[in-house]
Amino acid sequence: MTRPAPNKTPAWTGRSVPLLSEEGFAEALERLEAKIVALEALAKTPPKGAAALGDLVRMADEARDLGVSLRTVCRARQSSNAADTLPGTWLSSVKRLSFRLEEASGGILSAVRELPDEVRARAPFEAWLSPLAVRGSQSSSLFEAVMLPLGSQQSHLVATMKLRIPSEDGHMISLSYAQATSVLKTSPDNRFRRSVFALFNAWFAEHSAAFADLLNAVRGWKLHEAHAAGRDFMTAAFEADRITPAAQLAMMKALELRRENARLTITERARLLGERQLHVTQILGSVEGMHASAPEGLNGLDEVCGSLSSAMACTDPAFGRYLEEALENHWIDARSMSQRAGGTWCEDLPAYNATAVFSTLPSGTAGAFQFAHPLGVGFMHKAQHGEQAPLKRLPYSVIEIFGQLAVTMLERHMARKLEGSTEADLLRWQLMRRASNMLLMVPSRHKLLVDLLAARRDGILSASRFNEASRRGTHFSAARPTDATSTSGAGNLISTAQTRSSTTGSTPSATWSRSISPRPF
């Protein structure tokens, strides 16, 4: 395969992210089921010999890698077209097969534990018994029946967003959910961003009843699941991310004690602009008025990739090779299309020795740093391809650190490059914007999620109750240093993030990993 032309928007192909077609996916799904049927039969009476049992372990690992890859394909297709209903059906089938696979793997694991100590300490058995090993999906059929349709409904709801707004030249343009969120995160046009924000909030207010129903259903399910297992609703999240309750409480307390210092990331940015306060859309938005474009080293795809490779060289020289491979093999899709879902992510394709990166083309300083995050995650996934399946499944709390590391290293690289230049304030804005997100917005969203779960135990919550909780969360993080007349409209925006994380199973790990990732200051 060949590298895309200079600064040409990278896009997935049928070879880079396989099975996007119905025929290809159906064939791979049949292959996965055939492997699982064989494993189920053999797991009933596992072989006693180490050689035969080792073959069975490797067979299960191959099936797990294929299952993970098929999940990634489902997400890739859904992200490419949020209105597509097929990925939800596909994902349901993959998860049902994955549940059967883990059931069969349990029988194989029991046989592995009966091997002599010296045999268990060798490959391929050692990985299955490692304290770092993570078992696959244990979701029940009831979970699949409830949660998957709710997740699909949320995707289809946001896919209907079409915001009509005048452009700079006076023509009316239509923005999808993905395009609107991109404007809010990366556009340096303050007027345009505020206009989109107002329409964005109005759209969610108009659909608030539907999203409230979704949130009530998801939160209600999580409480039911915890109660049925005889556990607190946070226990499963802590276990999945290998975080102890004591560590989580200590982290949140430390963030709370330093909240006033963290708020300086907002007040100092207001001072940079010569303003008394920041509008709510400026807290996580790009800077306006300092520079129309990104500084040298962050202009366009090629410059961003070059800077990121240089920045990561001291951490691991292999990162540059991964980035080159990702571009040459079309593992990155950064197209801007109205039907695309919002967000930026990277998932693994271990069965195909590849990764899938979904992002937007880096435009401006904020877009460049946003682009770095999924590439850091992708590098971590690719580095794990030599490991057995149980060791590839790192918890989100660990995976997120690799994304944050890539952003941090790029920030440090650009700080050295721009030191003493007229563009230094642009980077300073980026550093404080990111700190505002990590130290204020993410913890407040985590607090919001926990508060809503606690409130949901008392009954169904109204849309107004959700928005009131969102407004409290916004004021908890940044009320005083922002435009108070504007933060009252932030509730619907934060509720949007709450809806998205609710349907994807949010955990405390986002707060944890962002708080302990290396900081450039």
What do the predicted segments below correspond to?
Residues 499-516:
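C-terminal substrate/ligand-recognition segments
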Residues 169-186, 232-235, 288, 296-385:
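Active-site-adjacent "gating/activation" loops or surface patches in catalytic cores
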Residues 86, 90, 356-360, 387-396, ...:
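Short beta-alpha connecting loops at secondary-structure transitions
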Residues 378, 398-412, 511:
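An active-site-proximal "capping" alpha-helix that borders the catalytic cofactor pocket
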